[in-house]
């Protein structure tokens, strides 16, 4: 069986950055990890309608800085920054240190795997035909400059008795090329028939120079060895 490695995990440190960037000693590591998890859980639930793509957590000098990548920054910020201030206070309480929240706008949500997957799952919950939702997502991504996209849905599609998996692909999605910038994410649609899983891979092109290339010295030309003739 051809099982696939996680496209983001295998590219960490090559072309993909980490979502949490901090260092801690052995004593503090578990607490930091636990508060990271709780902060992500809270923000994901609180901003479920704000089209959040990524949450990046940093911990500079006894504080916590959260960068929210969203396609709808107005919803996160709220009137005169009221909503973001409420979020900051809760995050500070969870982490137990002063908190800072930054907002980063996602310019092209059609090229973000998480936002595309969430869009498809919300359409499935509204009883849109799964093939139509998949094709629309693929066409929008290709129109905005994606080199390739693959969308997969699995579950009781169309209310069928037997669960199945269907996928649709356009362009190239080279999963084995480590320098390929592949954005991968998943989402779930909670329908009356059960849960339908959605997976999205978006290939945006190759990142050259992600890591310093080491030039290999050319091997010196070696004299050819004469072959001995075997005895007859």
From Swiss-Prot:
Transmembrane stretches, start-end: none
Pfam families: KH_2, Ribosomal_S3_C
Lipid metabolism found in the keyword field: no
SUPFAM superfamilies, per the entry: Prokaryotic type KH domain (KH-domain type II) (SSF54814), Ribosomal protein S3 C-terminal domain (SSF54821)
One annotated GO molecular function: rRNA binding
Database matches in Gene3D superfamilies: 3.30.300.20, Ribosomal protein S3, C-terminal domain (3.30.1140.32)
Entry keywords, A to Z: Ribonucleoprotein, Ribosomal protein, RNA-binding, rRNA-binding
Keyword Hydrolase: no
Organism domain of life: Bacteria
Domain KH type-2: 39-107
Cellular component terms (Gene Ontology): cytosolic small ribosomal subunit
Matches recorded under CDD domains: KH-II_30S_S3
Database matches in InterPro entries: KH_dom (IPR004087), KH_dom-like_a/b (IPR015946), KH_dom_type_2 (IPR004044), KH_sf_prok-type (IPR009019), Ribosomal_S3_C_sf (IPR036419), Ribosomal_uS3_bac-typ (IPR005704), Ribosomal_uS3_C (IPR001351), Ribosomal_uS3_CS (IPR018280)
A Gene Ontology BP annotation from the UniProt entry: translation
SMART domains: KH
Biological function: Binds the lower part of the 30S subunit head. Binds mRNA in the 70S ribosome, positioning it for translation.
Similarity annotation: Belongs to the universal ribosomal protein uS3 family.
Assembly behavior: Part of the 30S ribosomal subunit. Forms a tight complex with proteins S10 and S14.
Full protein name: Small ribosomal subunit protein uS3
Organism for this UniProt entry: Sodalis glossinidius (strain morsitans)
Gene: rpsC
């Amino acid at each position: 069986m051809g099982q696939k490695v996680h496209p983001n995990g295998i590219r960490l440190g090559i072309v993909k950055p980490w979502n949490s960037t901090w260092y801690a000693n052995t004593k503090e590591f578990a607490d930091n990890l636990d508060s990271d998890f709780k902060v992500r859980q809270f923000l994901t639930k609180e901003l479920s309608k704000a089209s959040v793509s990524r949450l990046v957590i940093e911990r500079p000098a006894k504080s916590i800085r959260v960068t929210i990548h969203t396609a709808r920054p107005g919803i996160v910020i709220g009137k005169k920054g009221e909503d973001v201030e409420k979020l900051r206070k809760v995050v500070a309480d969870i982490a137990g240190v002063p908190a800072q929240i930054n907002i980063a706008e996602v310019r092209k949500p059609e090229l973000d795997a998480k936002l595309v997957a969430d869009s498809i799952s919300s359409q499935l919950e509204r009883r849109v035909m799964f093939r139509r939702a998949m094709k629309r997502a693929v066409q929008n991504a290709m129109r905005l400059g994606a080199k390739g996209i693959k969308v997969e849905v699995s579950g009781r599609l169309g209310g069928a008795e037997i669960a199945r998996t269907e996928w649709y692909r356009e362009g190239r999605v080279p999963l084995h090329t480590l320098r390929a910038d592949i954005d991968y994410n998943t989402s779930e649609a909670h329908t009356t028939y059960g849960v339908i899983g959605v997976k999205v891979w978006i290939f945006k092109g190759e990142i050259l120079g992600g890591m310093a290339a080491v030039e290999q010295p050319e091997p010196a030309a070696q004299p050819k060895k004469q072959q001995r003739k075997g005895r007859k």
